[in-house]
Amino acid sequence: MEYFSNPSIINLFRQCTSLVSLPDISKWNISNVKDMSCIFDGSNSLISLPDISKWDISKVSNLSYLFSKCESLVSIPDISIWNTSNVKDMTGMFYECNSLIYLPDISKWNISNATDICYMFYECKSLISLPDISKWNTSNVRDMNNLFDGCKSLISLPNISKWDISKCKVEKKEKCFIIVLCY
């Protein structure tokens, strides 16, 4: 088992534009990692990911642009059991995953400490549906602009009318409630 003592594994496979697949990284011990931003960002030829569902991300505070621009990914491993309770930044996590049709059931993620979820599903053009994220605790989110912008294949959205948007930036309040621009 590979152990990462460094609290950051940012940009690990970033811009590996010719990379089609990865070796088995499922047994990596990342329990000490705090920053996972941009790990696969721009690896636009990746067609699949190894099973990363058992990664212990309980100390991670930054997941921004994690799968961003993985334009050839059709699905993401089942990351539904990830402990996201310490994550503050989820900006652009699935940004421009153009071929992604479905997401794992992320409805039970604890995002109560998240402050930024803007562009999370931005330009996921093939995404047909979303898990029921209506029960996400968004009380600390300050920026959720363009959350679903460009998700032109979405048939419906979960009922997010009860999300707490009281801490969203005032200058972005009109875009804060994110149902804008799903074309």
Name the predicted role of every residue range:
Residues 1-183:
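Negatively charged
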